[in-house]
């Protein structure tokens, strides 16, 4: 069996199927997208064509860049089955009906490559039922890959396997999902709902049914879940609306039909009359006319409303006073909501622990699933172990009071074996590696025979000490003759300048120190650009303002596909002051089109939505796109780059243009027009300009803007 999946076929061009196809295209892999024949049209591929067109229209774009669509080949299941012969992996994403899936499998089997893998994206059907009628040689190559919607943005994929599947198949799929598509995979047993739906939907149904029965305030419950338990702001009722009441009914009904009568899901999912009535009135959530919440418009303003379950009327959401600041306070309260949450949490953890080991014997996988699949801040085991005082004993005590028998996991005190260190999944390079240089804002470490610079400030913001140590790090790398890697602590490369520091200088009238900070930053960026060794930046998350300037001065970038980067300083009333303006002029070097594009990047605060857009919009030449942010340093260390040819600053040619006549400024504000005029003055005064002159202009403009009340107001609003 070959080790690599080179081409994929996705069958089913609905929202999920087309999203998976787009994800694969984003990784620059060829993908075939097939769906049924449109018999009512002269175009047999109309269904798939419309689906692909829709990829460009969605608010959260499934495509990382428009031309990625060229990796998608379309067809239908009548005329184009031969396209399957070229594919190493076939992902089925069709309706959740077993009979229809079986019909499809029988249809495509004759066209499969000898070692091709079949995967179903089902979220409700068991693996054993999907493959029951398949030939043995196909069964050993059949898995479930449960992607989450939207596939591009949700990191989790549940991989469902059994003992009949070959190890090389599991390895091949796992490598493709993680390295090529950037996913974190959780291997699940073949049980109803796998992990995410079994755990997440149980909690949703438990809370919603119990709250309705007790006539409690939905808004209060959602805010408590968000504040005290670390759930997203949608809470429970908001998430129910987001998923869709019709979809929740489908999932829960499927679970009920598959689970034994003894399973607690049967007990909590009983009285559904209210839900059925809401569905009848198209109150199915965000995609309907409303749900538990809805947005209405009054006098041009959007108003969030909450439903009155008794008559399905709506009224504006009122601000609620939450007196609990922690989960411990909540659970120790004798209030209505204190008692409600004590019952909810007890019932939830009784159910959760009853799933070990049948659903999975790895509790840390459950935590990862809930954090990635449902965006919880804590996994459920992490929450009870770390955030609640004597949490496990509390559950056992409450279970006794509620006369609920303990599952084996609790009765045998398995929770005592929980390793708290495993809840921190981040790889700590500082612990693993030798520190070469260090201060309170950054470290230079020796990792795998390489020099890695790690910023340690909040959001990796930039200040004096970061720049001082970075200059030392460059010198150290040059002395060793080694490339220097800039790697982010946490999920973000750098959010830019320490705005609190900048605001303090402005408020104190200390513009001398502010100018020195600008000079230090500019000097450091020039150190990077003109160093004798390569500066290789590993960028993920955000690289904004000064963080973007770090990238612009690196000789090579390994950027995660989901990178958000850009020169956004104008949003706080400033301009890029650490060579950002200089770089935008230098990178155009006489090219009118490039100069206009680069000026617009600054004026319009262009924050790109992907690494592909950053490469195109900011004219980045030496960049490799990485799909999995967790492997970004590994990918950087594998680069084979020839020895750096050190360049020297040259004069920059400026084309003679009138920027205003080239750019639509009709929607520009006073600040944008002011900065545009400053740039025009530079163009009018010079045919050629040196970097040193541009850097001086850059500092002068920055300091001038820093003294305006508007800038101070913007900075105060952000810093707080």
Swiss-Prot record:
<dbReference type="InterPro" id="IPR045004">
    <property type="entry name" value="ECH_dom"/>
</dbReference>
<dbReference type="GO" id="GO:0004300">
    <property type="term" value="F:enoyl-CoA hydratase activity"/>
</dbReference>
<dbReference type="InterPro" id="IPR029045">
    <property type="entry name" value="ClpP/crotonase-like_dom_sf"/>
</dbReference>
<dbReference type="InterPro" id="IPR006108">
    <property type="entry name" value="3HC_DH_C"/>
</dbReference>
<keyword id="KW-0443">Lipid metabolism</keyword>
<keyword id="KW-0456">Lyase</keyword>
<keyword id="KW-0560">Oxidoreductase</keyword>
<dbReference type="InterPro" id="IPR036291">
    <property type="entry name" value="NAD(P)-bd_dom_sf"/>
</dbReference>
<protein>
    <recommendedName>
        <fullName>Putative fatty acid oxidation complex trifunctional enzyme</fullName>
        <ecNumber>1.1.1.35</ecNumber>
        <ecNumber>4.2.1.17</ecNumber>
        <ecNumber>5.3.3.8</ecNumber>
    </recommendedName>
</protein>
<dbReference type="Pfam" id="PF00725">
    <property type="entry name" value="3HCDH"/>
</dbReference>
<comment type="similarity">
    <text>In the C-terminal section; belongs to the enoyl-CoA hydratase/isomerase family.</text>
</comment>
<dbReference type="InterPro" id="IPR008927">
    <property type="entry name" value="6-PGluconate_DH-like_C_sf"/>
</dbReference>
<dbReference type="Pfam" id="PF16113">
    <property type="entry name" value="ECH_2"/>
</dbReference>
<feature type="region of interest" description="3-hydroxyacyl-CoA dehydrogenase">
    <location>
        <begin position="1"/>
        <end position="384"/>
    </location>
</feature>
<dbReference type="GO" id="GO:0070403">
    <property type="term" value="F:NAD+ binding"/>
</dbReference>
<dbReference type="Pfam" id="PF02737">
    <property type="entry name" value="3HCDH_N"/>
</dbReference>
<comment type="similarity">
    <text>In the N-terminal section; belongs to the 3-hydroxyacyl-CoA dehydrogenase family.</text>
</comment>
<dbReference type="GO" id="GO:0009056">
    <property type="term" value="P:catabolic process"/>
</dbReference>
<dbReference type="InterPro" id="IPR006176">
    <property type="entry name" value="3-OHacyl-CoA_DH_NAD-bd"/>
</dbReference>
<feature type="region of interest" description="Enoyl-CoA hydratase/isomerase">
    <location>
        <begin position="453"/>
        <end position="720"/>
    </location>
</feature>
<keyword id="KW-0511">Multifunctional enzyme</keyword>
<keyword id="KW-0276">Fatty acid metabolism</keyword>
<keyword id="KW-0413">Isomerase</keyword>
<keyword id="KW-0520">NAD</keyword>
<dbReference type="GO" id="GO:0004165">
    <property type="term" value="F:delta(3)-delta(2)-enoyl-CoA isomerase activity"/>
</dbReference>
<dbReference type="GO" id="GO:0003857">
    <property type="term" value="F:3-hydroxyacyl-CoA dehydrogenase activity"/>
</dbReference>
<dbReference type="GO" id="GO:0006631">
    <property type="term" value="P:fatty acid metabolic process"/>
</dbReference>
